[in-house]
Amino acid sequence: MDVNPTLLFLKVPAQNAISTTFPYTGDPPYSHGTGTGYTMDTVNRTHQYSEKGKWTTNTETGAPQLNPIDGPLPEDNEPSGYAQTDCVLEAMAFLEESHPGIFENSCLETMEVIQQTRVDKLTQGRQTYDWTLNRNQPAATALANTIEVFRSNGLTANESGRLIDFLKDVIESMDKEEMEITTHFQRKRRVRDNMTKKMVTQRTIGKKKQRLNKRSYLIRALTLNTMTKDAERGKLKRRAIATPGMQIRGFVHFVETLARNICEKLEQSGLPVGGNEKKAKLANVVRKMMTNSQDTELSFTITGDNTKWNENQNPRVFLAMITYITRNQPEWFRNVLSIAPIMFSNKMARLGKGYMFESKSMKLRTQIPAEMLASIDLKYFNESTRKKIEKIRPLLIDGTVSLSPGMMMGMFNMLSTVLGVSILNLGQKKYTKTTYWWDGLQSSDDFALIVNAPNHEGIQAGVNRFYRTCKLVGINMSKKKSYINRTGTFEFTSFFYRYGFVANFSMELPSFGVSGINESADMSIGVTVIKNNMINNDLGPATAQMALQLFIKDYRYTYRCHRGDTQIQTRRSFELKKLWEQTRSKAGLLVSDGGSNLYNIRNLHIPEVCLKWELMDEDYQGRLCNPLNPFVSHKEIESVNNAVVMPAHGPAKSMEYDAVATTHSWTPKRNRSILNTSQRGILEDEQMYQKCCNLFEKFFPSSSYRRPVGISSMVEAMVSRARIDARIDFESGRIKKEEFAEIMKICSTIEELRRQK
C-alpha cells in the first residue's frame, strides 16, 4: 500500500516539521595538513579591518603592532575594528545604571574565587601550547613542564598550589634577563637489526638545556599556537583556532570568571547557561517584548549575524571594560584582571607547521617550516599564497606573527557577551528617547534583536540606530546575513523559536548510537541519550521505543553479542551459546553476555546491572561484579561518569551517565607504538603526574579538595591528613593498634626521605 507522505503531517503543527529538514547526516569534514594558510588569512583579515589604525613597535620584542582604537569613524558598511573607548565606557556605565550593583557584586564573587582557585584548574582543557617544547601538549603536561622550568629558575611562589601564586611567578618570569629550559630532541641513527639483519632507524630521546634571553622568552610567553578547527559543518573553507600557552591561560580564566558572574545577572545573556534554562531565559525576553508591544505597536525580530566577530574585537576594548568594571576594587585585583587583555594586545600567533612541498617528478617531499617564510624565495608558491606571505612578512618574528588587534576564536566569550548585552541594554525607551525601542539576546557572537515601534519607519530607524551603535564598539552586524521577521519566528544559537522554542530533535541524531568506550559504558550512554531526549527534545514515546530497539540492535552488532538462542554466527557466538545453556535464570544475563533486553521507556534511568540483579544466578553475579577478576583491567569507577556526545551542531557536550563497575567496564590498553617515539618521556611524565593527582584526590575527597592547603607541599598535606585520619580511625576502633603504628611509621619515613632530599 502506498502512503501519501503529506498525511504524516496532518496532525503535526508546522513548526514540528523542522526535524525533517535535517541536512547533517554522515561525518563532518575534518581538516588535513597544515593550518598555516588559514592562520595567515586570519592575521591578514584582522589587520585589514583595522588598517587605518596607528602602527607602533613593541619595545621589548620589536614586534610591529597596529592599534585601531579611537580610529576614524566608519563611513561605509564595511566591517571595521575602530572601537571608540568613550563609547564603550558609556555603554558600561548605562549597563550598571540599569543593573545597580552588578559590577560591584560580581567583583566580590570573583575575588573570593581567585583566593580559592588551585593551580590544577589549568590542567583542564585539551591541547595547550607548551612554550618549553614549542609545540602543543596535553594541558596537564604543559603545566607540569612550565612549573618545572619556573622552579629551576628560582620562581617558587607556585609551590603554595594556588593559581594566583603561579601567576605571580608568570609576571616575575617576564622580568628575568634569561630563562633556562629543558627541551627534548631526537637523535636518529641507522643500525642493523640482529633478528632480521635489515637496517632500521633507531630513535633516542635526549634532553638538553637551553637558555632563552628575555626577548625570546617574552615572544614564547605571548604566543598562541594555531590549529585548524575540525568538524565544522556547512562551511566550504576551514578556519584557524588558537591554543594559548600556560602564561596566558590563568589570567584569561580569571577574567572569564568575572565576566561569567556578570552574565549570570543579565537577562539578555545566552551564556553561561544552556539547554532548557537558556530557552526559558530567552522566552522571557520575547514575552516581555510581545506583551509590551500594545495593539498600536509593531514588533519585529532580527535573527542576527555578525561579521568576523573576534577579528574586529580588540583587547584594548576589553582592558577599558575591565578598568571600568573594577574601578572601586583593590589594586591587586585590578592588576590581575588587566594582565590578560594587555597580553592579548601584544600577542603573537604561531604559524603552525608551515608548508609541505612535493615534486611529482622526483618523488620528493619537503616541509618548509614557518620560520623560513621570512626569507624563502616566493617563486615556489602559487599566486594566492605568495600574496599572503608578502602581506605577512613585515609582521614575522621567528616563525610567529605579531597580531595585536583581534581576539582569536573562543578566548573571551563571556566578556564579549557583556559588551554585546551593553548595546542591547541601550534600547530601552529612556535611552532611545524616541518612539522605537529594542531588546534582545546575546551569546558570544550570536544575537537576536527585537525592535518595537509604532510603524515600519520606526522599526527601520531602530535597526539603523542599533547598527550604528554597534559599529562604535567594534561590532559589525552583517546586513547580508541577518534577516528580519515579525516577532514570533527567529533563530538564536541554533534554537528555533516559533511561538515558543521548537524541539529540533534531529540535531541530536549523531549522538544516538554506540559510543565505543566499552560494553558497560556504551549501554549506559545509549539509554541515557534516549532518556535525555525524551526529557528535553520532545522525543515521543513511540519514537523513543523505536530508538531503543534500534540501539539494542546496533549494540548487539557492535559487540557481537546476539542472544544466546539466536541463529546468527559470530566470533563470540560459540562462547555465548555455552553461557546461555549453563545459565539457569536466562533473564538475568546482560545484553552484552547474550541476554535479552529488559529496557523499555519507563526504566531507562536504571543501570542494566541493577535492573537484572535480582534475576541473576549467584555465580554469574560473583563473576560479573568481581574486582579481582584477572581478565579485566579496571578503571576506578566513580558512581557517575562523563561521556562526550556529539550533537550535529555546536560543541561536543559532556553528558553524565550512571556507571556500575562490572567485568564489562574494561579499559583498552594504550597503543604501544607511542613508546618508540619522542613522546615517550612526555608520556611517562604525564603518567607520573596523573598518579600524583589521583593519590592527592584519595587523601582529599573533592569536598575538601578545593580549599587551599596553606603553604605546605602536596606531600606534607597528604602526610598530615593521613595522620589525622589514622588517629580518628584508631580512636573509633576502625583500625587496630598495629595498623595505626604502621601508618605512623610510614609517615615518619616519608618525612625523613624528604629531609634527606
From Swiss-Prot:
Parts forming coiled coils: none
Reactions this protein catalyses: RNA(n) + a ribonucleoside 5'-triphosphate = RNA(n+1) + diphosphate
Where does the record place the region Promoter-binding site? Answer: 249-256
Q: How is it modified after translation?
A: Phosphorylated by host PRKCA.
Where in this chain does the record put each RdRp catalytic domain? 286-483
Q: What is the first-listed, main subcellular location in coarse terms?
A: host cell
List UniProt keywords, sorted A-Z.
Answer: Eukaryotic host gene expression shutoff by virus, Eukaryotic host transcription shutoff by virus, Host cytoplasm, Host gene expression shutoff by virus, Host nucleus, Host-virus interaction, Inhibition of host RNA polymerase II by virus, Nucleotide-binding, Nucleotidyltransferase, Phosphoprotein, RNA-directed RNA polymerase, Transferase, Viral RNA replication, Viral transcription
Listed Polar residues bias regions: 55-64
Q: Which InterPro entries match?
A: RNA-dir_pol_NSvirus, RNA_pol_PB1_influenza
Q: Which residues does the annotated region (Disordered) include?
A: 50-82
Q: What is its EC number?
A: 2.7.7.48
For this UniProt entry, the molecular function terms from Gene Ontology, in alphabetical order, are: nucleotide binding; RNA binding; RNA-directed RNA polymerase activity
- BP-aspect Gene Ontology terms: DNA-templated transcription; symbiont-mediated suppression of host gene expression; symbiont-mediated suppression of host mRNA transcription via inhibition of RNA polymerase II activity; viral RNA genome replication; viral transcription
Q: Where is this motif: Nuclear localization signal?
A: 187-195, 203-216
Q: Tell me the compartments it is located in.
A: Host nucleus; Host cytoplasm
Judging by the UniProt lineage, the source's domain of life is Viruses
Q: Identify the enzyme class.
A: transferase
Pfam families named among the record's database cross-references? Flu_PB1
- Give any Gene Ontology cellular component: host cell nucleus
Q: What does this protein do?
A: RNA-dependent RNA polymerase which is responsible for replication and transcription of virus RNA segments. The transcription of viral mRNAs occurs by a unique mechanism called cap-snatching. 5' methylated caps of cellular mRNAs are cleaved after 10-13 nucleotides by PA. In turn, these short capped RNAs are used as primers by PB1 for transcription of viral mRNAs. During virus replication, PB1 initiates RNA synthesis and copy vRNA into complementary RNA (cRNA) which in turn serves as a template for the production of more vRNAs.
Quaternary structure, per UniProt, is:
Influenza RNA polymerase is composed of three subunits: PB1, PB2 and PA. Interacts (via N-terminus) with PA (via C-terminus). Interacts (via C-terminus) with PB2 (via N-terminus); this interaction is essential for transcription initiation.
User: Which family would the database say this protein is a member of?
Assistant: Belongs to the influenza viruses polymerase PB1 family.
**What's the name of the protein?**
RNA-directed RNA polymerase catalytic subunit
The scientific name of the source species is Influenza A virus (strain A/Korea/426/1968 H2N2)
Q: Which gene codes for it?
A: PB1
